[in-house]
Swiss-Prot record:
Protein name per the record: Endoribonuclease YbeY
GO cellular component labels: cytoplasm
Keyword Cell inner membrane among record annotations: no
Gene name tied to this protein: ybeY
Lineage: Bacteria, Bacillati, Bacillota, Clostridia, Moorellales
PROSITE patterns for the chain: UPF0054
Amino acid sequence: MECSINNQQADYPVGEELLSTLNRVLQAAAAAEGVAGEAEVSLTLVDDAAIKELNRTYRGVDAPTDVLSFALEEKGPDEPAYADPGGDKLLGDIIISVPTAVRQAGEYGHSLARELAFLAVHGFLHLLGYDHDTAAGAADMEARQEAILAGVGLRR
């Protein structure tokens, strides 16, 4: 899977090691979910002002959030999360607020790398149609996220 990662914020330094970690965790998520072939995902790191604007525009919430996902294809309730159609497939865009991730990493007592990786996996699963609107959906997403992160050595 091809990952395009863009840092569009200047509040916090994001070095090559962190970018490599994000690519690695997205590749692990793709492998765990059976995403193969020429699939593509875009991950953009932004500041709170940028994500607040997106959140207001697309969700009607006038506040910053940690992660937003914009899937190119919406999944119905009975559709599989991912079905490889063969050929190129742009899954969608993941947008993460780095300042919010920094705050959350402090609150949860883990590294920024771990928090950004968690948010990237969370956003990726949303692109595949996973959601946490129900207790069962939330439990499934949580289990998948933790398994993927543990698989790349990013435990809580």
